[in-house]
């Protein structure tokens, strides 16, 4: 069976934290959740997989592709990540987020996005900083 994610010996060091020699595989068709204490490295691992930060060592393949390869940016269009909270600048609102996502994802569908905004009862013009934690998770 092929793996959707292969992480081999990945390390990342910050001033006060080290993710050391992480190795894991996720078979295709599987769903994975990362659970752990605050500061355990869950968000760092996701950022490494999505190539939002670079590892100090090791390798990461996603869908059979090195996540640092030029084609990975296009492959990210088909990858879903759900974080515990959205990390948008505090002054943005739902309409601003739509514009950013439209520029980020080729397949972005504003009608579907605003359908979910309505379904989840999120105010389109309210600043992100004024959202509750639950509202941020929905966004």
Please report, for each region that a protein language model flagged, where it lies by residue:
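ABC-family P-loop ATPase nucleotide-binding domains
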Residues: 77, 83-139
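Conserved beta-strand
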Residues: 7-10, 17-27, 58
């Amino acid at each position: 069976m092929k793996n959707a994610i292969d992480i081999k010996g990945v390390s990342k060091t910050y001033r006060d934290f080290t993710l050391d020699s992480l190795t894991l595989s996720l078979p295709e068709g599987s769903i994975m959740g990362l659970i752990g204490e605050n500061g355990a490295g869950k968000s760092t691992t996701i950022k490494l997989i999505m190539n939002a930060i670079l590892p100090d060592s090791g390798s990461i393949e996603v869908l059979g592709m090195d996540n640092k390869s030029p084609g990975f940016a296009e492959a990210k269009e088909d990858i879903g990540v759900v974080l515990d909270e959205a990390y948008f600048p505090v002054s943005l609102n739902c309409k601003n987020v739509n514009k950013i996502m439209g520029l980020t994802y080729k397949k972005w569908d504003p009608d579907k996005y605003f359908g979910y905004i309505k379904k989840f009862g999120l105010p389109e013009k309210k600043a992100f900083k004024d959202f509750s934690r639950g509202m941020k998770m929905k966004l």
